């Protein structure tokens, strides 16, 4: 083996070998239990980020663990066509390179352009996934716009439409005026901004006056431009100021429209003036109020967000209405919405109807891709009736067919599902699954899988002109079918039978509604088991938190705190890292701040750590469902762990290769250390498997670390040296056999989390055990064996460790050189302690570096010594001649004086009332903590002084 562990040399060639050999494929033996995971499809436009690395490490750990248990294992990969994101990427590309828009190309040619882009750049993220060691069956890779998946999408749409679970309706949606499409709530970014609240006077009609004698009401609004579409004013029915006005009317200024005053609990008596203008066509809350009170909807905006020439009027069912005039004053027609705001406020002011303007903090919705303010817009869209689909999906979680890990996410799921709204599934884009609906010249709609099917089913002659709906489906609609469409549905394929329901879905909690819930609803509606019962898409949902930076901030380009997982694998220079973080920024003014922060955090760039260290860190930080603060020090620690495992393996190989390791017969005698490490490893296997079975990857990683570093490397390898240096043939054979047995099994145990280093070492170790197989990936996973429990060995060796640690502690406390041989006395030793010493003298003497161990006769107190209590005895080290008493007392006195000075400094700081009052609580607490630490250290030094003074 190479003397130095260098992940760069081993990882990529090994992965290419695995993929070429087909080790990632299911073995196909359907008599064995299946285990499958469908990867949450990343956007085809995307690059691998920390969230992907985190979730994929968890998935690959599970897949490798289950594969090693002999299961028929499938990890299905794929990418999402990502409607808006992909369309924008290609639009920007043709604008930059050719100065063209998609409209210059036309729909079909532009879509061809996107397919061309996907062919060139779409594989970027899957190549990055390979770098993580993901054991995905790449031959089955899917794309949400593949022909098979497109057929599944059409099938689902047509069936739902025929069951009256899809309909077309005019309702409010989040509208992006820049991209000119409806967008989902997930694509809306709510930003806190400092804005204004305008207080406007609306004159009361018919000479009516308020309780205070005023002939107007004052409404407060943050969006005065929408007043052109007002169709009511709401007051709280319990509000004594206005309850007598319910049923009366106000005159809408500038328009002259009479609109009713309605009593509705949406109006908050404590907020603003207590009067709320109602604009059902431009506000989600007002839309609901309008429905309750049968108010017409007046749409005043174009799809670009400009004021229309004349308004559109609809009733609460979305049908065209003549309930009020569609006139809009000429002065405002065609104005951009925010220009209209200024003009309207000025017009109110001129009429004396602007009561006041107050500064107001508010939350404004922005499109996360278009970057402009989102408008609630009344549009014709396609909807899924979600309540019908939600009922069985709720029951599946209630009765435990689907388990959430951690369990608390069930409540989040239930709260949304039990109050579910119909789902808007249409988008005004070109890239995506085009809606399989056609219209004739009279506006009649026909839904079918193809135009030919529509004509045939509806007996439409060839001369009847049909035009397909221009809209495409929401990306979440096609990804909602992911678990079964990727397995060949609507065909009843063998894969669907073998791998569905899938075993686990690993996902972020932020898409629990957008994706997880919709997968459950759609799968249960379309996939039935042999008894005709709805089938769930997966048995377990493992929810992850977000990965944040070291300060707990969300990673984002604008904060300049994004860490690319592959930069931690391969390393990156400071210069390249700065370019990555500050190049092509949407807000270049932030670049200097980001530069300074990056230079401070990574003065020398990022060192290469290798994939295994990254995976180990991600597993170790995976505490269930919580957000994770990334920690570079942990990454360094796990890189050191890999190094430790490498060096330990080299030690084992140096002592076992070309030696008799007892695998071909011959007498073997196991030492206590051999028996202990076998028993310790057996227990480790049980705890580790329990952790993985319970999705506690953090606990599993810590168990692996603790056993490998502390038990195997720091104790067992040291304990083999007395045998290696002077054992009999049988003892040597026993220890070599144990070294190889434990290392080989440990590599199998660690493989799911750290696949590259374990395979590399295993390929070298396997020959010693006579294994001829080509890969560790397909080796059996270690199993706990109750018959291998050896409590005596565990207890005896723990006692020996205790004795050795006691000697080492005395050396450290008394400043005795580590290499100086010591005499040890045992006082008042029980028979058990005496047995342990006699049977294991060589272990204790070698590891504690002792000249001798003497058992004192009963009643003999022994010379003046430093003592430590161990189980069943008192351990003494006589100090005579070991230390220079005067020099040691002098050294301790100086240490005590130094601590007293520090304690005094902090005491005076804490007695200063000004400091305590002004300093942040955390700073004061830190000072108190420091003082407590110094006090404990001082007490220990004084105890040592007393011992030495008595010598």
UniProtKB/Swiss-Prot annotation:
Residue ranges crossing the lipid bilayer per the database entry: none
Keywords: Aminoacyl-tRNA synthetase, ATP-binding, Coiled coil, Cytoplasm, Ligase, Nucleotide-binding, Protein biosynthesis
A GO cellular component annotation in the UniProt record: cytosol
Localization per Swiss-Prot or TrEMBL: Cytoplasm
Keyword field contains Ion transport: no
Reactions catalysed according to its record: tRNA(Val) + L-valine + ATP = L-valyl-tRNA(Val) + AMP + diphosphate
Residue runs in coiled coils: 880-914
Motif stretch ('HIGH' region): 42-52
Enzyme class: ligase
Pfam families: Anticodon_1, tRNA-synt_1, Val_tRNA-synt_C
EC number annotated for this UniProt entry: 6.1.1.9
Binding positions for ATP per the UniProt entry: 557
UniProt motif 'KMSKS' region: location: 554-558
A biological process from GO: valyl-tRNA aminoacylation
Cysteines engaged in disulfide bonds, as pairs: none
SUPFAM superfamilies: Anticodon-binding domain of a subclass of class I aminoacyl-tRNA synthetases, Nucleotidylyl transferase, tRNA-binding arm, ValRS/IleRS/LeuRS editing domain
Family statement drawn from the similarity comment of this UniProt entry: Belongs to the class-I aminoacyl-tRNA synthetase family. ValS type 1 subfamily.
Subunit structure: Monomer.
Function field: Catalyzes the attachment of valine to tRNA(Val). As ValRS can inadvertently accommodate and process structurally similar amino acids such as threonine, to avoid such errors, it has a 'posttransfer' editing activity that hydrolyzes mischarged Thr-tRNA(Val) in a tRNA-dependent manner.
Protein name (Swiss-Prot/TrEMBL): Valine--tRNA ligase
Organism, as annotated: Pectobacterium atrosepticum (strain SCRI 1043 / ATCC BAA-672) (Erwinia carotovora subsp. atroseptica)
């Amino acid at each position: 083996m190479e003397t130095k562990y260098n992940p760069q040399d081993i990882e990529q060639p090994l992965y290419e070998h695995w993929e070429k050999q087909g080790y990632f494929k299911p073995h196909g033996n359907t008599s064995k239990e299946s285990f499958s995971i469908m990867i949450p499809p990343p956007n085809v436009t995307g690059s691998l980020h920390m969230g992907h690395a985190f979730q994929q490490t968890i998935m690959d750990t599970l897949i490798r663990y289950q594969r090693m248990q002999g299961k028929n294992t499938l990890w299905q990969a794929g990418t999402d066509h990502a409607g808006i994101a992909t369309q924008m990427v290609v639009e920007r590309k043709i604008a930059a390179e050719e100065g063209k828009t998609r409209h210059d190309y036309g729909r079909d040619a532009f879509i061809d352009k996107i397919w061309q882009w996907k062919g060139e750049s779409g594989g970027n993220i899957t190549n990055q996934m390979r770098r993580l060691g993901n054991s995905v069956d790449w031959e089955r890779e899917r794309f949400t716009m593949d022909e098979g998946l497109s057929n599944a999408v059409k099938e689902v749409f047509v069936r739902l439409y025929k069951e009256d679970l899809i309909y077309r309706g005019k309702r409010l949606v989040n509208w992006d005026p820049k991209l000119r499409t409806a967008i989902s709530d997930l694509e809306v970014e709510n930003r806190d901004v400092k804005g204004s609240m305008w207080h406007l006077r609306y004159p009361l009609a018919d000479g009516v006056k308020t309780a205070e004698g005023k002939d107007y009401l004052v409404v407060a609004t943050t969006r005065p431009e929408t007043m052109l579409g007002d169709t009511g004013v709401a007051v709280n029915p319990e509000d004594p100021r206005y309850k007598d006005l319910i049923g009366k009317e106000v005159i809408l200024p500038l328009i002259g429209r009479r609109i009713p005053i309605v009593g509705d609990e949406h109006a908050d008596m404590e907020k603003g003036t207590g009067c709320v203008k109602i604009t059902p066509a431009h506000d989600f809350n007002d839309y609901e109020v309008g429905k309750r009170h049968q108010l017409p909807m007046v749409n005043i905006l174009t799809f670009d967000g400009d004021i229309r020439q004349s308004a559109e009027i609809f009733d609460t069912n979305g049908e065209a209405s003549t309930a009020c005039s569609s006139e809009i004053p000429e002065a405002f027609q065609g104005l951009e919405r925010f220009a209209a705001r200024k003009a309207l406020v000025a017009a109110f002011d001129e009429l004396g109807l602007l009561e006041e303007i107050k500064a107001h903090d508010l939350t404004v919705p922005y499109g996360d891709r278009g970057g402009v303010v989102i408008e609630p817009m009344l549009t014709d869209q396609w909807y899924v009736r979600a309540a019908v689909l939600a009922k069985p999906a709720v029951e599946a979680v209630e009765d435990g067919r689907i388990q959430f890990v951690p369990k608390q996410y069930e409540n989040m799921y239930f709260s949304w599902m039990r109050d579910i709204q119909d789902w808007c599934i249409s988008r005004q884009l070109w890239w995506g699954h085009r809606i399989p609906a056609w219209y004739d010249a009279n506006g009649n709609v026909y839904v079918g899988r193809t135009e030919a099917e529509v004509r045939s089913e509806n007996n439409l002659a060839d001369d009847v002109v049909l035009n397909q709906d221009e809209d495409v489906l929401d990306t979440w609609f096609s990804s909602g079918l992911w678990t079964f469409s990727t397995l060949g549905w609507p065909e009843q394929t063998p894969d669907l039978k073998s791998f569905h329901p899938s075993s686990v879905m690993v996902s972020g909690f932020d898409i629990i509604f957008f994706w997880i819930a919709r997968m459950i609803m759609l799968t249960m509606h379309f996939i039935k088991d042999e008894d005709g019962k709805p089938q769930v898409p997966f048995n377990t949902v493992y929810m992850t938190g977000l990965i944040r930076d070291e300060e707990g901030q969300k990673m984002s380009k604008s904060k300049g705190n994004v860490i690319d997982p592959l930069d931690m694998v391969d390393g990156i220079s400071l210069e390249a890292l700065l370019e990555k973080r500050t190049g092509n920024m949407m807000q270049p003014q932030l670049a200097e701040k980001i530069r300074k922060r990056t230079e401070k955090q990574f003065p020398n760039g990022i060192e290469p750590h290798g994939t295994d260290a990254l995976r180990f860190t991600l597993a170790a930080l995976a505490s269930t469902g919580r957000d994770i603060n990334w920690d570079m020090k942990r990454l360094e620690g796990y890189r050191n762990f890999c190094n430790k495992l490498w060096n330990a393996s080299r030690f084992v190989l140096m002592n076992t290769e070309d030696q008799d390791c007892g695998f071909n017969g011959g007498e073997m005698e196991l030492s206590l250390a051999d028996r202990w490490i076998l028993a310790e490893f057996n227990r480790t296997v049980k705890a580790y498997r329990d952790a993985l079975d319970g999705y506690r990857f953090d606990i599993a990683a810590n168990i692996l670390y603790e056993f490998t570093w502390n038990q195997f490397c720091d104790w067992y390898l040291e304990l083999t040296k007395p045998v290696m240096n002077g054992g009999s043939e049988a003892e040597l054979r026993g220890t070599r056999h144990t070294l190889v047995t434990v290392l080989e099994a440990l590599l199998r145990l660690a493989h799911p989390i750290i696949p590259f280093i374990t395979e590399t070492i295993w390929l070298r170790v396997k020959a010693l055990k006579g294994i001829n197989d080509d890969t560790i990936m397909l080796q059996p996973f270690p199993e706990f064996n109750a018959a291998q429990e050896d409590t005596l060995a565990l207890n005896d060796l723990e006692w020996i460790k205790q004795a050795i640690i006691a000697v080492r502690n005395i050396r450290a406390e008394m400043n005795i050189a580590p290499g100086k041989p010591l005499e040890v006395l045992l006082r008042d030793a029980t028979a058990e302690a005496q047995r342990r010493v006699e049977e294991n003298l060589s272990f204790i003497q070698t590891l504690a570096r002792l000249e001798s161990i003497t058992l004192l006769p009963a009643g003999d107190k022994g010379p003046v010594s430093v003592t430590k209590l161990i189980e069943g005895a008192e351990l003494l080290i006589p100090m005579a001649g070991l230390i220079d008493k005067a020099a040691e007392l002098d050294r301790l006195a100086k240490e005590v004086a130094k601590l007293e000075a520090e304690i005094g400094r902090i005491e005076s700081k804490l007695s200063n009332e000004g400091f305590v009052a002004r300093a942040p609580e955390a700073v004061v607490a830190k000072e108190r903590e420091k003082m407590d630490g110094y006090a404990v250290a001082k007490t220990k030094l004084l105890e040592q002084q007393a011992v030495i003074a008595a010598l």
